[in-house]
């Protein structure tokens, strides 16, 4: 933005070589490289000619940029407004002519984002994703039998748990019958009961105590077995899901947010594991108890059982509809929980940006909206559960009252004894409780099916780029000519916004090729296509005439080293991050790669190579993270080295030192270097420059040829250097 137009004071943080920013400053405040105090404060006109000034000494580090800059700017016609690429939006910078104070700090360089589509384009793309997305699988109903496939190989554990369940349930269901016999013996009129069921009373009660101990022991064993079985299933399921995620291509992660995938790996897998163990066990126990209870009720009195059976159809029908409702609601709830996890992960990861723009209240309100949605779903389930279980409880209690009334008449008529009526009532309570429990287990299993549908979506996802399928990559691939032939590409989430259209060029082995394009022109997309994170929509990418899509992806990527513009580090030590690309690397190799990438700062840390970098490397500066990323790439000694604006996060001094390392690598003709950059100092060292714009190659050639007036490269460099006002 133009600070003059909006009446703002601008405080840019810039590298010393970024004179397009520095020349517009009214005041310069250079910071020393070794200290955090201000070295000088003056206007740029006073600092530039002073050899002892900090700005002068640091600006000399990029003198090679100035040579090319001056050679271009001297040939330019003043006042011309040239910007050669459509669909790109240059920012309206202008030289300050009004007395507005601004400061330039020589530290940080700001990169502008790419073209943003219109709202209509975004809506059109989203509608296509929802209807035609190749990775958006429909919400299929998962049957119980497929759910059991997740527990494959656990048959022996299920057999043990089932056997223990039968024994413990048998002991439990014998209690009403035994109680009835004790009551009949006590109501016989004999003052001293010596035998119960033909067994001496003392022996009977000791045996009864032993029976209860057996039931408790079996119940203990069942719970332990099923808990371990549940954790085993969940652990194996999570490992399988995570391995599946690691095998999917970039298009999948464009469609599915990380927070939703984390929710599937954690919450959904836990629900499914419990459904296959604890809930299934409870359901089996309720089934056994209900069947045994009804059988004993028939044995005691078929007449009372006939009256009792009138309650079964409405309860069974209600349980079926309730279970189906909960299954669908569970799927919706798990989706909402996945959205909540996604938002939490995204907002917490960018909390500093939120705080910098005072967006705390906005983000809290947005998070509360997701919580409110989840609460509404939980409230719907609560009302449904209350209606179902309240109704079944009322019907059960009403049935008990009816049984008492009818049973009392039958006792008075002498059709049954008091003990038999007591046993029947206890069996009624047991059977009724088991039926209600069975309904609850059915509900929990339906929840498991809802969660399982999300897991099977992930397990059934088929990437367009299979990681382990394809022919072996020849060992001589490092000397191959890489060719783009009429390549067309659009990101899967935005199929209507074409990035490339008939893109064609060659990269010869052992050369240093620079890819140049305006912001949003597809520079980084070329590296993603080369690494096969995505597949071209049309055309082919060849290696010595062989389509790289026929190669094994893992083997193909093993020949590449990548240094991205945004360094990515993992939690762990510095040494572990450098050795990430080569797990068997020795300490010597790690230190050598770090030395070549100018990671001398590691030796200043107390723990040196064992220093923890923190989550995503937050304990290191941007430049330190970038140099570790460079060392990680160099450790592999790749045949193809992709530098995607690899020095963008470094300060001037560190960049020059790393550039020397990269420059020495470029002289190594056994390695092909593909540089994606916008800095003139990096571009001018390339053997070949490929200028990309409007989805195709506009021109290619050497720096000397393309830097002539009239070329697209010349116009782009003039705009980047601030010599042309857009």
Swiss-Prot record:
ATP binds at residues 517-524. The chain crosses the membrane at residues 158-178, 196-216, 306-326, 386-406, 423-443. It is found in: Mitochondrion inner membrane. Residues 158-447 form the ABC transmembrane type-1 domain. It is a multi-pass membrane protein. Residues 1-112 form a transit peptide. SUPFAM superfamilies: ABC transporter transmembrane region, P-loop containing nucleoside triphosphate hydrolases. GO terms for molecular function: ABC-type oligopeptide transporter activity; ATP binding; ATP hydrolysis activity; ATPase-coupled transmembrane transporter activity. Residues 482-719 form the ABC transporter domain. Keywords: ATP-binding, Glycoprotein, Membrane, Mitochondrion, Mitochondrion inner membrane, Nucleotide-binding, Transit peptide, Transmembrane, Transmembrane helix, Transport. Gene3D superfamilies: ABC transporter type 1, transmembrane domain, P-loop containing nucleotide triphosphate hydrolases. Belongs to the ABC transporter superfamily. ABCB family. Mitochondrial peptide exporter (TC 3.A.1.212) subfamily. Mediates export of peptides generated upon proteolysis of mitochondrial inner membrane proteins. This is ATP-dependent permease MDL1, mitochondrial. It comes from Schizosaccharomyces pombe (strain 972 / ATCC 24843). The gene is mdl1.
